[in-house]
């Protein structure tokens, strides 16, 4: 057990870092679509239910494991189980997580490429051909993915306080302000409130196994659970910090970010008569068309895309820290 292990500098910063790790692309390009495909408000209610009853307790367990062992997943599971079998479990979790991260890096590299285009020429329908050309260039994709990885490695190299804390304290509040601004601008559109109320109204006829498992999966996916990130971040928590409060606060802000993204994306897409989609299609095809029709959309779209890249970058930092800190 590492008694001299680095620790987060305050309880508030701990929550900021946790939120930065949890909020990512899944909250922005997956959550709104999942709501739309699964009955809107019905999906939201089940998502909240599973978050409160299952995801928050699971996060509490992961944070507790990390703090009590003062180590990453591999050593933490070995210590908790008291056998080499626990070490194997830790290795499996870390390796699975790192493998899935390789795909996330490519996506984030595409997002970095798109952010550069947006900063120079805006983020609207006119830029779609340029995005597609970049995404079709495999070498360019790998180059940007490597740039993102190097950036994440550098932040981790700086340490918990000088690296992870410092970038989180800048990016998380910035992203929150951008989301608030986008939601306010969206609800200035005529009829946006009506679209949102209709979308949030539960449709109980949509309740089935697919909806239930989708909501359960989103609750776990959204908080970054899986025995890696929250274990390593838990190892940096102070002994006197209330883990339950930290887990609940992280879940609250993470879910709030997902809901605010929905409040921005759904009314905008419906207002302009576009089809809801998910993943890259939503981000690089549907949203540019919406921004093109939105007053001031050239600027608003650029701000949105750059802020999204920055907050998604924090998830990559957390992944690199979880992998490097566990091995």
Model-found features: residue ranges?
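Membrane-interface "cap" regions at the ends of multi-pass membrane proteins
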Residues: 1-29, 56-63, 67-79, 84-88, ...
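Central hydrophobic cores of alpha-helical transmembrane segments in multi-pass inner-membrane proteins
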Residues: 26, 46, 51-63, 73-75, ...
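Short helix-terminus and kink motifs of transmembrane alpha helices
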Residues: 59-63, 67, 106-114, 158, ...
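Inter-helical loop and helix-membrane interface segments of multi-pass membrane transporters/permeases
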Residues: 2-6, 33-38, 68-92, 105-161, ...
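Transmembrane alpha-helical insertion/packing segments
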Residues: 11-50, 101, 186, 190
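Membrane-embedded translocation segments of transport machinery
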Residues: 2-4, 8-10, 165, 169-317
